[in-house]
């Protein structure tokens, strides 16, 4: 199980809010990277999704692990995508996708790919 994931979005606050709603958790600011938010699932593992402003790159930086670097222009689309299991009905997921993201149903035969 993956308990931590980082993605970029044009509107990190909105994206984190939608993810938090779907996960039954809450979205909070992520101070290490200004303008970022953390969608917390509020489970026993501390699972969540960090949402950075589009154009943010995380570069290796020795002992601290990494440094956030904002590129001068947003790249538009990226290759990051993931499947997230939530205890939310399909209609609510569909409504959330209408707020700017995308969603599609997944079947058991599709899982793990």
What are these model-predicted stretches?
Residues 2-9, 41, 62-91:
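Vicinal oxygen chelate
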Residues 7-57, 95-102, 107-112:
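Core segments of cupin and vicinal oxygen chelate
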